[in-house]
C-alpha cells in the first residue's frame, strides 16, 4: 500500500513554541562534529518531531524505520505509512530495514520462553539493546556511512564532551557518558534504556529529552506534522499487533490449567496458564476469598499461581543479575541508591550490595550481580522485570530481577 500524499510542511517561525524547544534547537545547532544522523521513525509524533527539530537545526537527516513484524497491524502498516509521510513532509530520504528475523529471535522467542519459565519478561529494554539501536547503528554505518542515530525517547544523555559538568556519582564515572531521566516525569523512558552500552550512548541523540509531551504535541502542530494528533499506543507493540497481550500469548502458548494456591498450599482456585498472571496482581484472579489476594509467586515447575493477603505479600530484598553499569563503573562495596522496579512505579530507597555472579551470567558476558535491600517492603517485585538504579536523575545501571526474598531468605 502506497502512503497518501502528505500535506507540505508548514513554514515554521524561527520563534519556537516554548523555551524548552528553543534550548533543544540551540543544543542541536551547536553539536560538535559532523551533523549527519539517521532518525529512527516509528510513525508516531515523538520520532516525527525529533526528525523535524534536527532538520530545522541544520542536520543532514535520513529517516530509518525498522520493519519488525509481518502481517496486518498498526506497527507494521500504519506506522510505516506515517513514517514515510513524515519523510515526504520533511523532504528527507526514508529507508525501511527488514529486522523481522532479529525481532523474532531476540524478542518474541525470548518472551515466550520467559513466560514458560514463570517470569514476566521486559521486552522493551531488550529490544532497545538487541534490536532497535543495534540494527539502526549497524545499518546506518554500513549503508549510509552514518555513525549517529536519534530517536524520540524521553531521556537525556550527558556526553562526556558536553560543557556542563557531570553529576557526581557514588562510584567511578570519570570519562563516561551518563544517561539521565527525561524532564517530563510522566513520559521518562530512561527505565527502558539502562542496558545500552557506552559505545551506543556516544552515538545517540535524544532531541526530546528536555521537552514535555504537551510541548511535543504543540511543536508538532506548529510544524504541521501529519502525526501531531496521532493517538499514542498504550501497550507493547506486540499487544497492539495481536490485539492484546493475551491474544499474543494464546498464539504461542497452549492453555495449561493449574491451581491457584495460598502460600501454605491450600487450593483456592484454578487458572488457564501462569503466563496470564504477574507478581502483585490483585484483580482478575477469579478467586473468592475473605480478603483481597495478591499474586506473590509463579511456580512454573508445578504450574501454580501462589497468592497471599497483602499483609503477607511484602518483600524485603531481591537479587538482580545481568547488571549493566551504564553511567558508572561497578561498585566494590554497598552503596545507597534509588530503585525503580516497574516502569510506572516511583523510585524507592535501597542498599545495593555486589554479590558473586552466576555461571549463566558470566557465560553471557554479564558478570555483574547484586542484592537490593529495600528500606520498606515492596509488593510488586517481579522476576524478569528490570530493577534500574538511580542517583537523582542519573541512571547508574540496572539488571533483571532473578530472585525475590523476605528478610529471612
UniProtKB/Swiss-Prot annotation:
Alphabetized SUPFAM superfamilies for the sequence: Adenine nucleotide alpha hydrolases-like (SSF52402)
Catalytic activities: S-sulfanyl-L-cysteinyl-[protein] + uridine(34) in tRNA + AH2 + ATP = 2-thiouridine(34) in tRNA + L-cysteinyl-[protein] + A + AMP + diphosphate + H(+)
Compartment(s) of residence: Cytoplasm
Any single biological process term in GO: tRNA wobble position uridine thiolation
InterPro entries: MnmA-like, MnmA-like_C, MnmA-like_central, MnmA-like_central_sf, Rossmann-like_a/b/a_fold
Enzyme Commission (EC) number: 2.8.1.13
Enzyme class: transferase
Gene: mnmA
Protein task: Catalyzes the 2-thiolation of uridine at the wobble position (U34) of tRNA, leading to the formation of s(2)U34.
Interaction with tRNA, annotated site positions: 153, 385
Region feature Interaction with tRNA, mapped onto this chain: 187-189, 342-343
The protein, known as: tRNA-specific 2-thiouridylase MnmA
Major place of residence: cytoplasm
MF-aspect GO terms: ATP binding; tRNA binding; tRNA-uridine 2-sulfurtransferase activity
Gene Ontology CC terms, in alphabetical order: cytoplasm
UniProt record similarity statement: Belongs to the MnmA/TRMU family.
Species in which this protein is naturally found: Prochlorococcus marinus (strain MIT 9313)
Binding of ATP, residues: 40-47, 66, 152
Active site annotation, chain numbering: 127, 237
Signal peptide: none
Keywords: ATP-binding, Cytoplasm, Disulfide bond, Nucleotide-binding, RNA-binding, Transferase, tRNA processing, tRNA-binding
